[in-house]
Amino acid sequence: MNELIKMVGIDYTEQRKKFPDFKAGDTINVHIKISEGKKERIQQFQGVVIQRRNPNTNGETFTVRKISEGIGVERIFPLLSPTIEKIELKQQGLVRRARLFYLQGKQGKAARIKAKITSKA
């Protein structure tokens, strides 16, 4: 029983370090391992981060939204999931909210997010 408590209490900072820092409004590309029968392949899911839930805990999740053939698709990923191969930060967004649920009712130009401009100095 004591060993189980130690395993649950493990801090996963090493596993967190392999992912970039991202927040709501950022455009990311998530590489996920998909196993179909005996085959295993990597599928990419690119979209805007709508929210991060339970930050800095072992149960942290993040929601990514994309538009596929005119239909909005949202997917929730656990940050410490073994199926996530890597996360690429494509673009940083400039937003004032931590949860961007207002994007669910918008399409096209109305759903755009301003890009954060970083200087290369």
UniProtKB/Swiss-Prot annotation:
GO molecular function (one): structural constituent of ribosome
UniProt keyword terms in alphabetical order: Ribonucleoprotein, Ribosomal protein
Disulphides: none
Any one GO CC term of the record: cytosolic large ribosomal subunit
Pfam families: Ribosomal_L19
Biological process (GO), any one: translation
InterPro entries hit by this protein: Ribosomal_bL19, Ribosomal_bL19_sf, Translation_prot_SH3-like_sf
UniProt superkingdom: Bacteria
Family: Belongs to the bacterial ribosomal protein bL19 family.
Classification via HAMAP family: Ribosomal_bL19 (MF_00402)
Task performed by this protein: This protein is located at the 30S-50S ribosomal subunit interface and may play a role in the structure and function of the aminoacyl-tRNA binding site.
Record-given protein name: Large ribosomal subunit protein bL19
Lineage: Bacteria, Pseudomonadati, Bacteroidota, Cytophagia, Cytophagales
